[in-house]
């Protein structure tokens, strides 16, 4: 059986990356919430 997690940096960044977050209003809300919470990492990064 094939495992479900097949890592790909490109796919990861296109789905959860900074540019995608900034491109929508809801994405910017996510970033601002994470800044307000004091997250060290705002986005997933490899």
Swiss-Prot record:
Coiled coil: none annotated. Transmembrane segments: none annotated. GO terms for cellular component: ribonucleoprotein complex; ribosome. PROSITE patterns: RIBOSOMAL_L34 (PS00784). Pfam families: Ribosomal_L34 (PF00468). Keywords: Ribonucleoprotein, Ribosomal protein. GO terms for molecular function: structural constituent of ribosome. One of its GO terms (biological process) is translation. Belongs to the bacterial ribosomal protein bL34 family. This is Large ribosomal subunit protein bL34. The gene is rpmH.
């Amino acid at each position: 059986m094939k495992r479900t997690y097949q890592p790909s940096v490109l796919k990861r960044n296109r789905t959860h990356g900074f540019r995608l977050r900034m491109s929508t209003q809801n994405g910017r809300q996510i970033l601002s919430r994470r800044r307000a919470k004091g997250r060290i990492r705002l986005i997933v990064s490899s």
